[in-house]
Amino acid sequence: TNGAVIHTQSRHATETNAPGTVRASGRIPSPGSWIGLKAHIKGLTTSANLEMHRGPIGYLGITQVEDGWHNACGLFRIDRSIKAKQADLLPAYLRKNGNHLLADQLQIADLRDDSFSAVAGFSLGNQPSTPGMMCLGDSHAIIPPFTGNGMTMAFESAEIALPHLIAYAADQFT
């Protein structure tokens, strides 16, 4: 019969040479020089709805989300001399980046318990290819910061690919 098997919430090993295989599962962990850090923080003093704090190894953006909470999200070049763990990584990277006053604010602010995340092991741009497999989204390429409208680009690209994938699954072309 025509159709597809869709695997979600898994790191299912795919057959790379199986006809019609499409990888749209996000980035493939690989050595990289960047670390992304994010947390929701209450108790920051900000002067605008969106603030950008930059330095020699990266940047941090801060924006209000709800009920006095701010989303703090940054991208930094990995520095192996930083020994901090978990939520302490964010102020440690800010200090290394020269953003000492902001790091001091983060140290005394409230951190939403389940909001901290760190992502490392990625490179920007084209990702390693897998022969015999079509890759979409971050599994194909990771756009650089400040490109703008990243999620819009992702949804529009998926919309372009979808009719072709449906036609292939229905044996309308090979």
Residue ranges of each PLM-predicted region?
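Feature captures the FAD/FMN-dependent oxidoreductase FAD-binding
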Residues: 1-26
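Short, well-ordered turn and helix-capping elements at secondary-structure junctions
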Residues: 10-12, 26, 56, 76, ...
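Conserved FAD-binding catalytic core of PHBH/FMO-like flavoproteins
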Residues: 20-99
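Buried hydrophobic packing segments
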Residues: 72, 158-161, 165
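FAD/FMN-dependent oxidoreductases across multiple families
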Residues: 82-161
